[in-house]
A protein has these predicted regions:
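Conserved nucleotide-cofactor-binding alpha/beta core module
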Residues: 72-191
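Class I SAM-dependent transferase core
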Residues: 1-80, 88-92, 96, 109-120, ...
Length: 212
């Protein structure tokens, strides 16, 4: 379904600087409309964020593509995702061969997305907990992607990143953030690149924003 719309989305992503052919193929093959409410299916392949309920959104396709291209996951890489949401980003990473561990703090959304993964046949490790604390049981990770904007970079996530791994997280206020791309170069040392202007839902948790 929506073959023409999916091809048009790929053209849009190319125009915005997404050049990794593996990433573009993932966006062509993974059907975004399956991750949003049926009433919004007609908007699934427009380059916009969309509401998915529970005061959450599915991110703009370009944003997901940008983070995925920066991460550039290789088959077998262990990737931790903070903020499962609709599940779309996790499935993109899974399609590219990564072993994905994903954390969602909203219990109702966790249940819905867990059921969706089961229905679609995706084997993604999913947990309902405070994402700012990470998932120490399976650390270290080759990459960590945070899909919500925080006031700072959680210490636990830095600790759970493998040497040479990348941590991608939007940092700023509750309305707008800059993407921080950290590559771990030593036990406590990182090379950091910062890219403006993004807008994510707030990262709630012990090392994030408080509820309210």
């Amino acid at each position: 379904m929506y073959e023409k719309e999916r091809q048009e989305l790929i053209l849009t992503l190319r125009e915005k600087g997404i050049t990794n052919e593996r990433v573009l193929k993932a966006f062509l093959e993974v059907e975004r409309h399956l991750f949003i409410p049926q009433a919004l299916h007609g908007h699934a392949y427009v380059d916009n964020a969309l509401p998915i309920g529970f005061d959450q959104t599915i991110s703009q396709p370009y944003t997901v593509a940008f983070m995925t291209q920066v991460m550039n996951p290789q088959p077998g890489n262990k990737i931790l995702e903070i903020g499962t949401g609709s599940g779309y980003q996790a499935v993109i990473l899974n399609y590219l061969g990564a072993k994905v561990y994903s954390i969602e703090r909203n219990h109702n959304l966790y249940l819905r997305t867990s059921q969706l993964f089961d229905n679609l046949g995706y084997r993604i490790a999913l947990r309902c907990s405070d994402g700012t604390l990470g998932w120490d049981e399976f650390a270290p990770y080759d990459g960590i992607i945070v899909t919500a904007g925080g006031p700072e970079i959680p210490t636990n996530l830095k600790k759970q990143l493998a040497p040479g791994g990348k941590l991608i997280i939007p940092v700023g206020d509750r309305k707008s953030q800059k993407m921080h791309i950290l590559q771990k170069t030593g036990v406590d040392s990182f090379k950091t690149t910062i890219v403006p202007d993004f807008s994510f839902v707030p990262l709630i948790g012990r090392e994030g924003w408080k509820i309210g």
